[in-house]
A protein has these predicted regions:
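Helical element adjacent to the flavin cofactor pocket in flavoenzyme catalytic cores
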Residues: 1-32, 36-40
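A secondary-structure boundary/capping signal
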Residues: 12, 45-46, 82-83, 206
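Catalytic metal-binding/acid-base residues of hydrolase active sites
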Residues: 15-16, 48, 210
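Conserved flavin/dinucleotide-binding core of flavoenzymes
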Residues: 25-27, 37, 44, 52, ...
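Residue-level recognition of strand-loop junctions within catalytic nucleotide-signaling folds
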Residues: 31, 83, 124-126
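Flavin (primarily FAD) binding-site architecture
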Residues: 41-62, 79
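Central beta-strand plus flanking loop segment that forms part of the substrate or channel wall
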Residues: 62-90
Length: 247
């Protein structure tokens, strides 16, 4: 994809500061001072973050109201890596569910051919909110203690000897502020005249939250991206046809 777009056209570490939409096109300005001018602009941020963008003119009031009311969840992960799949030696497949937490679901995500063994743990909801406020060493401790308790092993067990421990708190990320996808207020998504996800002027909106398939997942993001690209292409073709007709 990078080769298709052209690596010179991919600008990393260039957060968008403002978007100015006019009848003739869009100007996007980054926090690094770069300006990009185009006929159309596709915004793929979660709608929760629209309020962090300086969009001129502002989005319609109804669209702002919906975007400002969307919320992202506490959806966190802890990946505990080991040099052996010790849970299999105990007769378990690594999948578990817990109503006590902090881990509510975990599964074996090992890659056996590479001798990489891991349990991926999901720490979500209210438990995830509390877990995310802990210090890193505390998050590690409570996850290992829970795994040890579930599998009925002691302090000398391999569960307490991971070779790596990774965690991801999406609420801590500036450009996501949560996961999986923004949730709208009841009824916002189903109203026939809802502006949610609809284009405004030369601005088009894509993201997994707008997908009709696999909403909240990468597949949903791809589906929405394809639809957004088609929407822009159709709009440009219609504009070109209109210009030819006038001429």
């Amino acid at each position: 994809m990078a080769n298709l777009v052209g690596e010179s056209n991919i600008h990393l570490s260039s957060p968008v500061a403002s978007i100015r939409d006019t009848e003739t096109g869009v100007t996007v300005t980054t926090t690094t001072g770069k300006n990009f001018v185009a006929k159309k602009c596709i915004i793929s941020l979660p709608s929760t973050l629209y309020q962090d963008l300086n969009i001129s003119p502002p989005l319609p009031a109804a669209a702002r109201e919906i975007a400002n009311s969307t919320r992202l969840g506490h959806y966190n992960k802890a990946i505990v890596c080991y040099d052996t799949p010790w849970w299999r030696d105990l007769g378990y497949n690594g999948f578990l569910m817990s109503y006590k937490g902090p881990v509510i679901v975990a599964r074996d995500t090992s890659v056996d051919e590479k001798r990489f063994y891991a349990l991926t743990c999901f720490v979500n909801g209210d438990e995830g909110a509390r877990w995310g406020e802990m210090y890193p060493h505390e998050r590690r401790r409570v996850v290992l203690e829970q795994l040890a308790g579930i599998y009925g092993v002691g302090l000398d067990a391999p569960v307490y000897q991971p070779i790596e421990f990774f965690d991801q708190i999406w609420k801590h990320e500036t450009y996501s502020k949560g996961a999986l996808a923004p949730i709208t207020a009841l009824g916002d998504y189903t109203k026939p005249d809802s502006p949610y996800g609809r284009s405004v002027g030369n601005l088009h909106f894509v993201g997994t939250e707008f997908s009709k398939e696999w909403k909240g997942y990468m597949e949903g993001a791809l589906w929405s991206g394809e639809q957004g690209a088609k929407e822009v292409a159709d709009a440009l073709l219609a504009s070109k046809a209109s210009t030819l007709a006038v001429n």
